[in-house]
Amino acid sequence: MTPPGGAARVAAVPPATAPRASVSVPVRGPLPSTEDLAATQTSYDTVAGSYAALLEDELDARPVDRGLLAAFAETATTAGLGPVGDLGCGPGRVTGHLASLGVDAFGVDLSPGMVAEARRRHPDLRFEVGSILDLDLPDGYLGGALLWYSTVHTPPAQLPEVFAEVHRVLAPGAPLITAFKVGDRQVHLQHAYGHNLSLQVYWTPMELVTDLLDQAGLVIDARMVCEPAPHEKQPQGYVMAHRPA
């Protein structure tokens, strides 16, 4: 799900062969408690309708996002290794976009309210309640996985667990694309989308994300950082990877 703050659009693409800087932020810090996860779920249940209405047409003004999603869709459909999971799908906005590109896509989200909104808006697609930490999917089931700002409420210390689970459910050769906030900070939101809520939001260094994906056994294919748009405060990061065959 896209968190409060949106996504930036001015692309800066480092060469694929450029060496990576060393990771400046170790994977440390507390893991989320049961109460933290419940607060995230409840918050998105509360804002589901407002969130879906506000972001319904967001991709129309996001050519970079559409281009990256098109590249991912082409990779997944060409490989033809199975259905594509939009993991942390929110109200199904990106799931529906992938389906419009010919992808056999379905969505999973922690929030029952978001899943209900997704089913209402996209009755022809499948959406299920579930956690990206423990997906109810067989090993190697997915022909592609999307983590579109799905980890912004996940502390860095828990990212290895998320990426290991994604590796488990991806078929050998299947692609992954992830989008996230780039940086080294966290904030606690108490109001967004016209509602009171409780959400912890994390910014993560690009080098940390790519290193952790690599450690999970995934091969990095491309990475990109977009500078903040005028109304935004942080860069956005995108990584495409795949599980090796």
Question: What is each PLM-predicted segment?
Answer:
Residues 173-180:
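Conserved beta-strand signature within the Rossmann-like core of class I S-adenosyl-L-methionine
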Residues 133-145:
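A short acidic, Gly/Pro-enriched loop at the edge of an enzyme's catalytic core
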Residues 182-200:
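Short, glycine-/aromatic-enriched active-site segment of Class I SAM-dependent methyltransferases
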Residues 228-245:
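Core SAM-dependent methyltransferase catalytic element
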Residues 25-79, 184:
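Conserved class I S-adenosyl-L-methionine
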Residues 160-172:
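A short glycine-rich, Lys/Arg-flanked "PGG" loop and its adjoining helix->strand segment in the class I
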Residues 201-216:
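Short alpha-helix
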Residues 82-87, 91-134:
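Class I SAM-dependent methyltransferase SAM/SAH-binding core
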